[in-house]
A protein has these predicted regions:
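Conserved C-terminal active-site "lid" loop/helix of NAD(P)H-dependent oxidoreductases
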Residues: 214, 233, 246, 268-296, ...
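Mid/C-terminal beta-alpha module of Rossmann-like enzyme folds, strongest
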Residues: 184, 227-268
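Amphipathic terminal alpha-helices
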Residues: 294-317
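Glycine-rich Rossmann NAD(P)(H)-binding loop
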Residues: 6, 169-174, 198-209, 234-242, ...
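Catalytic helix-loop patch of NAD(P)-dependent Rossmann-fold dehydrogenases
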Residues: 83-101, 108, 116-164, 169-171, ...
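N-terminal Rossmann NAD(P)H-binding glycine-rich loop of SDR-like oxidoreductase domains
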Residues: 3-23
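NAD(P)H-binding glycine-rich loop region in Rossmannoid oxidoreductase-like domains
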Residues: 51-91
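NAD(P)-dependent short-chain dehydrogenase/reductase
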Residues: 121-126, 152-209, 214-223, 241, ...
């Protein structure tokens, strides 16, 4: 099968490309235009893509002529979305519409959305099922909710098969240290290497999140592409919540450091959800289940960050 992956050079995309190539597909990997492609192309054909340009999207789709598209490209940071809401919307919402509109009839599209779109759901009404109304409470979440509507409408009127993966929090080796657990892992790796004082700077640790390993996420996306029903939304989540405090404590323990944990006001979001917990029953019904223990995820994340340290740089990232 000819497969196009957008956002292929990103955290999840790079893992997905690796798995799809391993499964024997002809993979066309589209990364952000103007950015360097991975040194190891992994058997995929790489292309530059600017989702804010209809011309760029049309060129990539024409070249790949895909039977299936995994659309992962997007602005993925809640924090960054507060600084640039218009740019976030153009990339995530309008960019998705550009992709969906360019696909030939009969193509299959898996849109990767976000559980942030649910907004602040009362704790007693969680875990959250897919039929929950969307009430996004940050610019990133709003852009992802709009992307879903755009893709599903294109599926109705454009003759493409659209499946939506509404993903909850995920982490693991390869994650950018702009994101919480990857940042903590990088700081601890630097502390362990003697390159920083033993202080771990964190944000809000009272928040509880449904956390899943990136490799389990990729398995879910492949399963949804193969078996997901067109027009349906599927939560991609572990079905269990843990506080960020628990995750930090376990990460510190794994690191073997005695780092002191300090809250950095700069890391606290203007708006944060106290609990985000998903119901993964619909996805499990397709035969998927999480396979990687959370402690293994944290250990792999820490070692990945440690392998990319430059101890001459500060630990603030």
């Amino acid at each position: 099968m000819r497969v196009l992956v957008t956002g292929a050079a990103g955290f999840v995309g790079s893992w997905l490309v690796r798995d799809l190539v391993g499964d024997g597909h002809s993979v066309y990997a589209a990364g952000q235009a103007g950015h360097a492609f991975p040194a190891d192309r992994g058997g995929a054909e790489w292309m530059g893509l600017d989702v804010t340009s209809a011309e760029s999207v049309a060129e990539v789709v024409a070249r790949a002529a895909p039977d299936a598209v995994f659309h992962l490209a997007g602005q993925a940071s809640v924090g960054d979305s507060f600084h640039d809401p218009l740019g976030t919307w153009d990339v995530n919402a309008t960019g998705t519409l550009r992709i969906a509109s360019a696909l030939p009839k009969g193509a299959r599209l898996l849109l990767v959305s976000s559980a942030e779109a649910y907004g602040a759901v009362p704790e007693q009404e969680q875990p959250i099922a897919e039929d929950r109304p969307l009430r996004p409470c940050n610019p990133y979440a709003a852009s992802k909710a709009a992307a879903e509507m755009a893709a599903l409408q294109a599926g109705e009127s454009g003759g493409i098969q659209v499946v939506v993966a509404r993903s909850f929090n995920h982490t693991g080796p390869g994650q950018d240290p702009r994101f919480a657990l990857a940042s903590f892992a990088r700081q601890l790796a630097l502390i362990r290497a003697g390159g920083a004082e033993p202080v771990l700077r964190v944000g809000n640790l009272s928040a509880r999140r449904d956390l899943l390993d990136v490799r389990d996420v990729v398995r879910a996306y492949v399963r949804l592409m193969d078996s997901g029903a067109p027009g349906r939304v599927y939560n991609v989540c572990s079905g269990a919540a843990r506080s960020m405090r628990e995750a930090v404590d376990e990460l510190v323990e794994i690191s073997g450091t005695r780092a002191r944990v300090e809250v950095d006001p700069e890391r606290v979001r203007p708006v944060d959800l106290p609990l985000l917990l998903g119901d993964n029953g619909r996805l499990r019904g397709l035969g998927w289940a999480p396979a990687i223990p959370f402690r293994q995820t944290l250990s792999d994340l820490l070692e990945w960050q440690a392998g990319r340290l430059d101890t001459r740089t500060p630990a603030a990232a």
